[in-house]
């Protein structure tokens, strides 16, 4: 489990400890090392979740300063942080337009733990068959043509939790 003691170099620890009572805790998953070209979309998803009354535990995915923060952490600290946050989550929302081993791993871990998963992607992209072909009833895959549709999909998912 991720704790302040296990990551003394992580100066932003207080931001990742859940504080909201009664809010849905969401793990936001998106490509980090595979490319940050969708950072604006991650930020939009983060804002839509906050607006819907959810708490985003993995806020760092939408943080433009992520590389600076994570450069102070070991691989083991990042792994422990992310899995600790996933364990506390009511659901996982993954943006899967950009292929990412880490995102796929987080989706799989969430499903194994019986955590509902929403995978989002832009239209006309080659999303992995491991995502599109997954028959797990806890996983939903949705394409969004624009930000208005993206927000609506997110709000509907949160309300259904």
Swiss-Prot record:
Keyword NADP: no
UniProt-listed Enzyme Commission number(s): 3.2.2.-
GO MF annotation list: 5-hydroxymethyl-dUMP N-hydrolase activity
Coiled-coil ranges (or none): none
Catalytic activity field: a pyrimidine 2'-deoxyribonucleoside 5'-phosphate + H2O = a pyrimidine nucleobase + 2-deoxy-D-ribose 5-phosphate; a purine 2'-deoxyribonucleoside 5'-phosphate + H2O = a purine nucleobase + 2-deoxy-D-ribose 5-phosphate
Membership in a protein family: Belongs to the 2'-deoxynucleoside 5'-phosphate N-hydrolase 1 family.
Identification of the protein by name: Putative 2'-deoxynucleoside 5'-phosphate N-hydrolase 1
Organism the protein comes from: Methanosarcina mazei (strain ATCC BAA-159 / DSM 3647 / Goe1 / Go1 / JCM 11833 / OCM 88) (Methanosarcina frisia)
High-level lineage: Archaea, Methanobacteriati, Methanobacteriota, Stenosarchaea group, Methanomicrobia
């Amino acid at each position: 489990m991720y704790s302040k003691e296990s990551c003394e170099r992580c100066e932003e620890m207080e931001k990742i400890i859940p504080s909201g009572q009664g809010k849905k805790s969401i793990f936001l998953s998106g490509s980090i090392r595979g490319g940050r070209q969708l950072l604006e979309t991650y930020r939009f998803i983060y804002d839509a979740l906050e607006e819907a009354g959810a708490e985003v535990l993995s806020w760092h995915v939408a943080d433009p300063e992520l590389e600076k923060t994570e450069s102070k952490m070991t691989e083991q600290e990042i792994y422990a942080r992310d899995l600790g946050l996933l364990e506390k989550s009511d659901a996982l929302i993954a943006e899967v337009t950009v292929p990412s081993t880490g995102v796929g791993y987080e989706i799989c871990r969430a499903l194994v733990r019986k955590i509902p998963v929403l995978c989002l992607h832009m239209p006309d992209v080659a999303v992995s068959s491991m995502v599109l072909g997954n028959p797990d009833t806890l996983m939903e895959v949705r394409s969004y043509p624009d930000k208005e549709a993206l927000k609506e999909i997110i709000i509907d998912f949160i309300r259904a939790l």
